Amino acid sequence: VYIKADDYDDNRHFFLSQYFTNNYNSAVASPPLINSPVIITKIEVWITNVGISANAEARNVIGFMDLGETTTYDPTLIPNLIDPYPDNTSNDLYGKMNADVDIRKYTSASGQLINTYKYSAGTNFNKIENARKLRDSEYIIHPQLGYISLNRRMEDDEVLAVAYQYTVRGS
């Protein structure tokens, strides 16, 4: 699929992981069939809460760039393991973050990530206070290709975080 530069809508379309980015072309190589063993079965999409009062669906969120990635953007931070699909055990980030009490305390998380793990805010992680969970009507998900399209363009200072579950070949 080729998109002309003037047809692309910046800051609206996002792959859920590198796996989907890396496998997109092979998945759509034989239209109209989609050749993907993965189907997203559940997703939550969180965004910076700008101008909307907090509600029951708002919560504090920390999003990690390399969580669940087999191939990490910053291999010096997390050792890579061999597993083709995104998973919390694809690298040791989830285990380290889950075990660290200071990260699980939202108020001390940034300091701990920066000082202890040498992570960079805005690169390795983003902390979103009072993030708003998007309603299903605010985005479209392509469950086999692993990307979402927001109904509106994100502003440059907004942050998006996702949590999702999937099956591979139905299991």
Question: Which residues fall in each region the model found?
Answer:
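Surface-exposed, low-hydrophobicity segments enriched in Gly/Pro/acidic/Ser residues
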Residues: 1-171
